[in-house]
Amino acid sequence: MIALRIYRALPPPVRRRLVNLLPAHRRLGVVRTLSGPRGGGTVHPLGARVAVPDGGVRTRAEVVATATPLEVWHRNLTAVTTALESAGIDYHCLRNDDFLRSSVAVLDDHRAAVSRLVRSAPALEGAHVRVVEVLPGRDQPEAAPAEVFQIWFPMTDARAGVVLGAQFACEVEFWTRHDDVVRAPRHNAVIDEAPVGAEPVRVAAALLSHFVPEADDHRYRTRRDLTVRAPDRVGFPIDAVYTWVDGSDPEWLKRKMAALGTPDGPLHAIAANTSRYHNRDELRYSMRSLHSFAPWLRRIFLITDSQLPSWLDPTHPMVTVVSHAELFADLGGQSSFNSHAIEARLHRIDGLAEHFLYLNDDVFLGRPLLPTHFFHANGIAKFFLSPAQFGLGEAKPTDAPVKAAGKNNRRHIQRQFGVTITQKMKHTPFALRRSIMRQIEVTLQADVTATAQHRFRHYGDLSIPSSLHQYWAYLTAQAVPGDIEYEYADLGHPSTPARLTELLARRHRDVFCLNDTDSDPNTFQEQESMLADFLPRYLPFPAPFELPDDVIAERRKLGATDLWRQARGADRRGRQLDAPTTPALRVGRHADSAVVHKPRVGPRLDAPTLPSGRIASGRHAAHQTEDPRPGPDLPPR
């Protein structure tokens, strides 16, 4: 304990010098012990209320089994509107300038009634309420700061590591009457003042926050004159694509060894090293991060070499699994061990949206994000330049594959556009468009086809979705540079445990990447322990496409190829072989690509109560509050 305190008190440069005195294979373990996550060891029962810091205050949060920011957003807004309706207080919902919060406007005449209501309404039992001052709008410089009631139900996981609280509060603001108009106390995205007595209507929740997906079928009451669609709202579907491999699968290893016996050119040491294919369940948590922090995604496509993760329910409507045999059907349908080759075919996925995010399984969303973090509302994509460079000169067999591909990209950009590129892209989700990838394939057909045919990384490859697409799109006015809060950590580096500890404590990054390109196999066990500790703490709530733990434990006894084979057999029979252990598989060609599946969205609550221990969620119940003065429904715009 004394050594731990001394180490943590030392300046970082001194820590690094001490660590470098250790043998290389021991550094990661020692640093992890000295700087790993502190606290959080107590596991609280579901339904318990535990003290947590939240929004600058200390409050008590309910321990729940699963929750997402979108579900909590709905929970808070539903409870407030239910309480107001039960008390007969007129209101309207409107878009908050903070996309993670909701707003409800009430006439100032009802301020005293609302003040009493928040202390007594059954719908708000257990809610945290605070009154804050907000600044008036720019066109009201003479106005005094206004009071806003923030109302939320704090929730946390069993370790109290994640708090879903004040950040997602519903804010009640008080509008003042001036003759025949009502005036907002602060800025909002639509209107500063409006006529008295506007027609009440119910609208899709998507009109109230850009975080809410178009497919969300919750409806809330507002004024007809507030039912406008903002020009900066993304209205087109966005999908996500992953490539994944389980390098420990015996049958996959046989396929890899057979392919290594017939190489298609000089093979760089990194091109087939073990760490490139090592599976630590990162995909499970990366997909969790999408479910939690990007509910606006339409569907997730998972490309595998006829493998299935043991934890994935491939029958879930949000997930479509695509095999290499399908992706490379016109090239013989063989397994590929080359990420550049697989990436060169992404635009050929049946049913994929024009706009999509491509992620490696070591990339995670770190907090709630909007579609506009990746695409402008007019469809233009964003890309995120890295300060790292891939060097000058032509690609050589001795170049690391990523550098060789960057040099090949540069050669084509020079020929097509007359400019020279030198920078890599950050390891973030890549915002891509199918039409641009098709254009690249048509223009550079020979090189794209050659890349797709290389079964291992080759110095002649192109890296299309991670570099070439971005520059090509930029130089054809279809993409622009963007900004993103980002963290990159090499799993084998001694500084990584301390950086993960900071990520857990601050949760201050939009995206983080936990990369492992060329680690010593002797450190794999330590890295696995580090991730097994970090990822469940950062993303503790399972997604709906994950199977129950007891089912996963049984499925882990089989290899990833065996799981695929069982599920594929179930798919051909039109039934499950041994449900729920072997769920029927939804694969690319068998999935109905014309159907747009609604994502699993917010809590379907019969307010005012919340089932203890879990937020109810799914498509089976609707927002059921009754409007005392019902108006017509408006469809999403």
Label for each model-derived stretch:
Residues 308-352:
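Active-site-proximal specificity loops/subdomain of glycosyltransferases
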Residues 308, 313, 345-390:
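GT-A fold catalytic core of metal-dependent nucleotide-sugar glycosyltransferases
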Residues 85-87, 110-158, 464-466, 470-575:
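Long, low-complexity C-terminal extensions of enzymes
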Residues 31-110, 206-326, 477, 514-520, ...:
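N-terminal anchoring/stem segment of glycosyltransferases
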Residues 576-594, 599-636:
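Compositionally biased, low-complexity flexible segments
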Residues 1-31, 362:
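Boundary detector for helix-to-coil junctions that initiate low-complexity/charged tails
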Residues 59, 67, 71-223, 227-232:
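Long, charge-dense tracts
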Residues 375, 381-456, 460:
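Long, charge-rich alpha-helical interaction segments
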